[in-house]
């Protein structure tokens, strides 16, 4: 499972405008992640679960800047999610209700764009064929990213 483990109760490191930073301990060491929710969601859906974006550092696993976007619904099989930041498009692959970039280089590029950007618009399509558009404010993202990087000693 690539999503953030819920085994240990996370500790809040801080809140930074639209983003919060968290830390918890696993057997192999610290895990730090930032969490944000869209400020606006558009779509003709009747029911939708929790929608959020996380960036996770797991130094013991040599994982850093792992971006995951949870849609609140099961994605259409084989569909991609698009994240657009100030005109630059990133394509993420989907598995059940979550989307990932797929490799460490692309994660780092997406995080760099999020740190430099103002707004991110994420579009996806549900298993039922419903299109969604979620808009995230990137205000506070850089501060939250610095906080998790410091807490997990990631450069």
PLM ranges: what are they?
Residues 5-155:
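A generic "folded-domain core" signal
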